[in-house]
C-alpha cells in the first residue's frame, strides 16, 4: 500500500491540493461527507442510537437543501456535528470482536470484523456509503466521480501524513494504534472528531 501510495496516490492528491482552490475542495469534501451521513444515520438506527440517527438524517436534509446539494456544511455551522458510523461499528455494537488488525489492499487500515463487513458489501455489489454513485449507468461519469472521491479522501490525509512522519518512530505501529483506539471509541459510542482519533491523532 505504501509503495502504491507514494508512487501514485499521494502525488495526485498533492497536485489536486495545489491546483484546486480550497473552497472547491471543501465543496467536494462536503458532498461526499453528505453521502456518508446517510450511511451513518442508517447504522445509528441499527445500533439503537436513535438520537445519532436522527442527527445524521437531519444533517443530510439540511445540507442537501440549504447547503446546495451538500456543497456547504450548513449543519455544522448550525451546531449539528457529524456522527462517524459504519457497518463495522454496528457489528461491534452487536458484540462482534474486532479481531486482528489488517491492512487491506488499497483500502488501508482495518480489522477482521470491519474488513469482513467491507468485503461482504462488495460481494453483494453494494458499496456504501457511495452506492448511488456506483449505480450510475454512464461508466466514464461513474468512474470519474469514484476517482474524485479517492483523491478527496487522500488529500484530506496529507496534513496528517506530515505529522506522522514528523513524530512517529514506527509509522506502522503509530497508524495501527491510532486506528484501533479510534474504532474502539466509536463502538463505545464516544463522540470523536471525524478527522482524528480520541487522542487527537490523525484518522487512518
Give the predicted meaning of each segment.
Residues 10-23:
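Membrane interface segments of multi-pass transport proteins and intramembrane proteases
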Residues 94-204:
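A structured, mid-to-C-terminal "fold-capping" secondary-structure block
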Residues 30-112:
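Mid-length scaffold segments of soluble, non-membrane domains
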Residues 26:
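A small/polar active-site loop signature that marks catalytic segments
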Residues 1-6, 10:
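Mature N-terminal segment immediately following signal peptide/propeptide cleavage
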Amino acid at each position: 500500500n505504501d509503495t502504491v501510495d507514494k508512487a501514485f496516490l499521494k502525488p495526485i492528491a498533492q497536485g489536486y491540493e495545489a491546483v484546486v482552490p480550497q473552497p472547491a475542495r471543501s465543496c467536494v469534501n462536503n458532498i461526499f461527507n453528505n453521502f456518508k451521513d446517510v450511511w451513518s444515520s442508517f447504522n445509528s438506527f441499527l445500533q439503537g442510537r436513535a438520537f445519532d440517527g436522527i442527527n445524521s438524517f437531519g444533517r443530510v436534509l439540511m445540507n442537501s437543501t440549504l447547503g446546495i446539494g451538500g456543497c456547504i456544511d450548513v449543519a455544522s455551522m448550525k451546531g449539528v456535528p457529524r456522527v462517524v458510523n459504519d457497518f463495522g461499528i454496528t457489528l461491534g455494537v452487536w458484540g462482534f470482536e474486532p479481531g486482528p488488525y489488517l491492512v487491506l489492499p488499497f483500502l488501508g487500515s482495518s480489522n477482521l470484523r470491519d474488513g469482513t463487513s467491507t468485503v461482504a458489501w462488495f460481494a453483494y455489489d453494494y458499496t456504501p456509503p457511495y452506492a448511488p454513485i456506483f449505480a450510475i449507468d454512464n461508466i466514464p461519469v461513474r468512474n470519474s466521480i469514484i476517482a474524485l472521491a479517492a483523491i478527496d479522501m487522500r488529500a484530506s490525509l496529507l496534513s496528517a501524513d506530515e505529522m506522522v512522519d514528523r513524530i512517529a518512530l514506527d509509522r506502522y505501529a503509530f497508524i495501527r494504534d491510532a486506528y484501533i483506539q479510534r474504532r474502539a471509541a466509536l463502538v463505545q459510542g464516544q463522540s470523536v472528531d471525524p478527522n482524528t482519533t480520541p487522542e487527537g491523532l490523525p484518522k487512518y
